[in-house]
Amino acid sequence: MNAGILGVGKYVPEKIVTNFDLEKIMDTSDEWIRTRTGIEERRIARDDEYTHDLAYEAAKVAIKNAGLTPDDIDLFIVATVTQEATFPSVANIIQDRLGAKNAAGMDVEAACAGFTFGVVTAAQFIKTGAYKNIVVVGADKLSKITNWDDRTTAVLFGDGAGAVVMGPVSDDHGLLSFDLGSDGSGGKYLNLDENKKIYMNGREVFRFAVRQMGEASLRVLERAGLEKEDLDLLIPHQANIRIMEASRERLNLPEEKLMKTVHKYGNTSSSSIALALVDAVEEGRIKDNDNVLLVGFGGGLTWGALIIRWGK
């Protein structure tokens, strides 16, 4: 028995903020943003819309798409950096709202790599037989910790949530390999400043991301016994088109094997990879027996990569 994905779901706020909207409030331009990041627009949550609201909506859809009910869920794992409070966890809030009376809940925090950490954690519970059905959510409301006076970072971020239901699948499907890591010495390059707003040293983060995403991708390929050409889809953290393209080139993959959502969502941190995965499923980009590589990096500094063979 292995652990795989049984259903997916997402939620993005209704409000769309384009690059042209940002031109009106800061010294930037659509051309400057697009050429450097690949971002054209992003979703921004309402003031009264919180991370747990985004996570709840995505989880609800994923459970339905898995053909399950909230009573079938054993555990909720939410990857996020924008909890409204230290406790209760976002996972506990959505467990209550969904009426999932049989489930436990916990949050994990590995910034933009958090969703990969959540998926790997869930897989261990399932493979040991401790739990059967686990909801993993990546959700963040980055707009509340964005410094809107810093044009170098304000143009990057958006809000949203993506979710998967994980459960038992056959030995030759599901999670084939993973690589999780941290380099705490780089924490100074990406963190929250004294005003609880995002600070980023873009040059250092770029170097770290390109290096670690590439190396982690090669490690999970080796551990899964796969070659680069065996990959059917690469879903990287949607931070910046240049970083994403560097990841694709490191693996010698054609353009059509790179999943891109950065243009319409921006960088949504913990939900970034999850949203891209859900869109790939909805667009028919993933079929049974496909080998899908998820890879990301985040504040910490952290990184996570994993390969899933789609299907049951």
UniProtKB/Swiss-Prot annotation:
GO cellular component, one term: cytoplasm
GO biological process entries: fatty acid biosynthetic process
Known pathway: Lipid metabolism; fatty acid biosynthesis
Top EC class, one word: transferase
Superkingdom: Bacteria
Localisation: Cytoplasm
Main function: Catalyzes the condensation reaction of fatty acid synthesis by the addition to an acyl acceptor of two carbons from malonyl-ACP. Catalyzes the first condensation reaction which initiates fatty acid synthesis and may therefore play a role in governing the total rate of fatty acid production. Possesses both acetoacetyl-ACP synthase and acetyl transacylase activities. Can use branched-chain acyl-CoAs, with a preference for 2-methylbutanoyl-CoA, the precursor of odd-numbered anteiso fatty acids, at 30 degrees Celsius, which is further increased at a low temperature.
One MF term in the entry's GO annotations: beta-ketoacyl-acyl-carrier-protein synthase III activity
Region (ACP-binding): 238-242
UniProt keyword annotation of Lipid biosynthesis present: yes
Family named by the database record: Belongs to the thiolase-like superfamily. FabH family.
Chief place where the protein resides: cytoplasm
NCBIfam families referenced in this protein's UniProt entry, alphabetically: fabH, PRK09352.1
E.C. no: 2.3.1.180, 2.3.1.300
Domain notes: The last Arg residue of the ACP-binding site is essential for the weak association between ACP/AcpP and FabH.
Active site as annotated: 112, 237, 267
Binding partners and assembly: Homodimer.
Reaction it catalyzes: (2S)-2-methylbutanoyl-CoA + malonyl-[ACP] + H(+) = (4S)-4-methyl-3-oxohexanoyl-[ACP] + CO2 + CoA; 2-methylpropanoyl-CoA + malonyl-[ACP] + H(+) = 4-methyl-3-oxopentanoyl-[ACP] + CO2 + CoA; 3-methylbutanoyl-CoA + malonyl-[ACP] + H(+) = 5-methyl-3-oxohexanoyl-[ACP] + CO2 + CoA; malonyl-[ACP] + acetyl-CoA + H(+) = 3-oxobutanoyl-[ACP] + CO2 + CoA
InterPro entries recorded: ACP_syn_III_C (IPR013747), ACP_syn_III_N (IPR013751), FabH (IPR004655), Thiolase-like (IPR016039)
A Pfam family: ACP_syn_III_C
Organism from which the protein derives: Listeria monocytogenes serotype 1/2a (strain 10403S)
Protein name, entry field: Beta-ketoacyl-[acyl-carrier-protein] synthase III
Keyword line: Acyltransferase, Cytoplasm, Fatty acid biosynthesis, Fatty acid metabolism, Lipid biosynthesis, Lipid metabolism, Multifunctional enzyme, Transferase
